[in-house]
């Protein structure tokens, strides 16, 4: 796996699923391929994206700044600086300075990542802030190691939270989660459908599913009534893909 592929993997792991994630993935690919060289326009685009947390925007802004060649005097962006200040906690800043001193002596991506993984996400973000604000300088490889360690810390906590929700025994939470997943799957089906005859059928199935979820929410239904909703939709989607000659793995 190449360095940039690894960076892209880690960064995308902290971006919520949805159309925006696909858009961000495309921007990262373009940036890493040297196709997008207007850093200012890229940062303006990032700043106005909805849904993303300030920290995720800060990390993406840091990655774009590291990768896209820019004029020396280009102003640092406030939204990135604010996101990478470790919540203003002086303890985070102290740890960030200690980490920075270690990273300065490091020259490899994996070495930097290994060192950084023993620090909290707050300290890692603060250390990125130091580098972003030009208070410290490390090699691009080392900076990417720091980015990936930060993303790993964030993804770990997101995974723990997600696992808690998936394994919860609360029937109301499970019911709502199934309906949200069914609704999201229906939306994906509509986006994939295109304009063929079979597409009309897929659109109809997706539309009915969304209406059913809306009705279930409006009138209130038994927590078990949503069981199998997403699976039924996915079976329909796979049948549609087969007719269209598209072979895709299940994405349950």
From Swiss-Prot:
Q: Which cysteines are cross-linked by disulfides? A: none
Q: Where is this region: Membrane-binding?
A: 1-164
Alphabetically sorted, this entry's keywords are: Host nucleus, Membrane, RNA-binding, Viral matrix protein, Virion
**InterPro entries in UniProt:** Flu_matrix_M1, Flu_matrix_M1_C, Flu_matrix_M1_N, Flu_matrix_M1_N_sub1, Flu_matrix_M1_N_sub2, INFV_M1
Question: Primary place of residence?
Answer: virion
Q: Where in the cell is it found?
A: Virion membrane; Host nucleus
Region annotation (RNP-binding) ranges: 165-252
Gene3D superfamilies linked to this entry: 1.10.10.180, 1.20.91.10
Give the record's membrane topology: Peripheral membrane protein
Task: Give GO terms: molecular function aspect only.
Answer: RNA binding; structural constituent of virion
One of its GO biological process terms is:
viral budding from plasma membrane
Q: Name one GO cellular component term.
A: membrane
Which positions does the motif Nuclear localization signal occupy?
101-105
Keyword ATP-binding carried by entry? no
Listed under subunit, the entry gives:
Homodimer and homomultimer. Interacts with NEP. Binds ribonucleocapsid by both interacting with genomic RNA and NP protein. May interact with HA and NA. Cannot bind NP without genomic RNA.
As a miscellaneous remark, the entry gives: Most abundant protein in virion. When expressed alone can form virus-like particles in transfected cells.
Q: Its function?
A: Plays critical roles in virus replication, from virus entry and uncoating to assembly and budding of the virus particle. M1 binding to ribonucleocapsids (RNPs) in nucleus seems to inhibit viral transcription. Interaction of viral NEP with M1-RNP is thought to promote nuclear export of the complex, which is targeted to the virion assembly site at the apical plasma membrane in polarized epithelial cells. Interactions with NA and HA may bring M1, a non-raft-associated protein, into lipid rafts. Forms a continuous shell on the inner side of the lipid bilayer in virion, where it binds the RNP.
For this chain, the family text in UniProt reads: Belongs to the influenza viruses Matrix protein M1 family.
Recorded protein name is: Matrix protein 1
Q: Which organism is it from?
A: Influenza A virus (strain A/Fort Warren/1/1950 H1N1)
């Amino acid at each position: 796996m190449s360095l940039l592929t690894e960076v892209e993997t880690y960064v995308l792991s902290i971006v919520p699923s949805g159309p925006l994630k696909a858009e961000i993935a495309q921007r990262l690919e373009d940036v890493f391929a040297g196709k997008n060289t207007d850093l200012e326009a890229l940062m303006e685009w990032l700043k106005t994206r909805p849904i993303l947390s300030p920290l995720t925007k800060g990390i993406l802004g840091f990655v774009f700044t590291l990768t896209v060649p820019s004029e020396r005097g280009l102003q640092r962006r406030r939204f990135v600086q604010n996101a990478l200040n470790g919540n203003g906690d002086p303890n985070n800043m102290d740890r960030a300075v200690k980490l920075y001193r270690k990273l300065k002596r490091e020259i490899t991506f994996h070495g930097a990542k290994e060192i950084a993984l023993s620090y909290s996400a707050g300290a890692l973000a603060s250390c990125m802030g130091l580098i972003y604000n030009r208070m410290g300088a490390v090699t691009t490889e080392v900076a990417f190691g720091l980015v990936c360690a930060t993303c790993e810390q964030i993804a770990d906590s997101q995974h723990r939270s997600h696992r808690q929700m998936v394994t919860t025994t609360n029937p109301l939470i499970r019911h709502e989660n199934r309906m949200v997943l069914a609704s999201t799957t229906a939306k994906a089906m509509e986006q994939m459908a295109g304009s063929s005859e079979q597409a009309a059928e897929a659109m109809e199935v997706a539309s009915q599913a969304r209406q059913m979820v809306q009705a279930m929410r409006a009138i209130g239904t038994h927590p078990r009534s949503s069981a199998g909703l997403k699976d039924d939709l996915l079976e329909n989607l796979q049948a549609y893909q087969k007719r269209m000659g598209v072979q895709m793995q299940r994405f349950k």
